[in-house]
């Protein structure tokens, strides 16, 4: 009987921007026959989606430190010490051959534990500006990867290989043909993030109303509002819901949504930028102005610099500015085709494979 393949532990937590790329790497490793377990928390998205993927989740007692009161920081430091002890015991007990960190504060104590116990440590930074945890772990890691150039300081040796994405998106990308040329209604996908984005929800329905009332009915909208915001947005669209407008709190199948869309209006999370490139979709990007280290603006530059998107600052976003952009695109469909091609040219589709290859090289070196 063939020997059981080694165990690899994933570390990622908090938001989908960390968890979903880690799931993509985990899926690749599982497809190669490796055992995969996960270090996370009971508070983040991983607590729901990791067990649903059939992967064992080990939870640490750790909390974020940044942006809190002094008392919260003291508590977080105590939790950090406890989490480090938990991580040391977990890594000793489970004995992984390699540990992969994909961001989120849970990666901190688990990554330090892996380093202390001389386990190969691989880290991947999704954003164009590295987060605190990955900046601290980078000098300890055996391999450092980034989704975009410029994520780390020049004194850190790292490789840019894109962000891992779910397999269904890669499969949809093979059929990503961009066919909008103005002969049918423009399909606008509005995505404010999994938790929604109130400024986007407040502005878009009014802009669409003004567009249609001005005589331009050649548009369809699929609007993700975020949980708990869909009723208000439906009321804002009103009678337009019978004229090609769809509203949903959350879109489960983003591959279908991107395939449907001719233009996407969205925030600038690292995973969103990567998915736009993989699917070759032009975008209006609205960076979250208060994101830590302003990383969403840096993420947006990846697409705006190559011509795959246009950026709209939140402070400048109102019904008039959105209406003006939509009118420009409707009047110049060739511009959208050019942007779509530029976005797709920036795609790096095989990041999960590269991270998995690195794990294998470290384990069998």
Task: Annotate each language-model stretch with its function.
Residues 86-100, 107-122, 135-140:
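Glycosyltransferases and closely related glycan-assembly transferases
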Residues 5-13, 30-82, 227-229, 313-315:
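Conserved nucleotide-sugar phosphate-binding/catalytic loop shared by glycosyltransferases and other
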Residues 335-349:
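A short, well-ordered alpha-helix in the C-terminal region of glycosyltransferases
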Residues 348-365:
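C-terminal alpha-helical cap of glycosyltransferases
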């Amino acid at each position: 009987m063939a020997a059981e393949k080694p165990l690899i532990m994933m570390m990622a937590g908090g938001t989908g921007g960390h968890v979903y790329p880690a799931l993509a790497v985990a899926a690749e490793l599982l497809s190669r026959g490796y055992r995969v377990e996960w270090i996370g928390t009971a508070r983040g998205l991983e607590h729901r989606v990791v067990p649903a993927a059939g992967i064992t989740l080990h939870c640490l007692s750790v909390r974020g430190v940044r942006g809190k009161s002094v008392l919260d920081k003291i508590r977080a430091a105590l939790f950090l010490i406890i989490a480090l002890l938990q991580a040391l015991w977990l890594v000793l007990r489970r004995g992984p051959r390699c540990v992969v960190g994909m961001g989120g504060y849970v990666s901190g104590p688990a990554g330090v534990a892996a380093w202390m116990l001389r386990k190969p440590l691989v880290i991947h930074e999704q954003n164009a500006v590295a987060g605190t945890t990955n900046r601290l772990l980078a000098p300890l890691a055996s391999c450092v990867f980034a989704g975009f150039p410029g994520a780390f300081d020049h004194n850190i040796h790292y490789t840019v290989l894109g962000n891992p994405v779910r397999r269904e998106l890669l499969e949809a990308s093979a059929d990503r043909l961009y066919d909008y040329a103005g002969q049918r209604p423009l399909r606008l996908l509005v995505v404010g993030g999994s938790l929604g984005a109130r400024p986007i929800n407040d502005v878009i329905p009014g802009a669409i109303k003004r567009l249609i009332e001005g005589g331009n009915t050649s548009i369809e909208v699929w609007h993700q509002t975020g949980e708990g915001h869909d009723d208000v947005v439906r009321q804002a669209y009103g009678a337009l819901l019978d004229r090609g407008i769809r509203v949903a709190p959350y879109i489960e199948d983003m591959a279908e949504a991107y395939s449907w869309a001719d233009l996407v209006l969205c925030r600038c999370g690292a995973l969103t930028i990567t998915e736009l490139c993989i699917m070759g979709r032009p975008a209006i990007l609205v960076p979250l102005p208060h994101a830590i280290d302003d990383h969403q603006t840096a993420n947006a530059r990846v697409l705006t610099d190559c011509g795959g998107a246009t950026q709209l600052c939140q402070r400048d976003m109102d019904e008039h500015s959105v209406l003006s952009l939509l009118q420009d695109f409707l009047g110049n469909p060739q511009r959208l085709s050019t942007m779509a091609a530029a976005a797709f040219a920036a795609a790096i589709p095989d990041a999960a494979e590269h991270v998995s290859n690195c794990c294998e090289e470290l384990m069998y070196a």
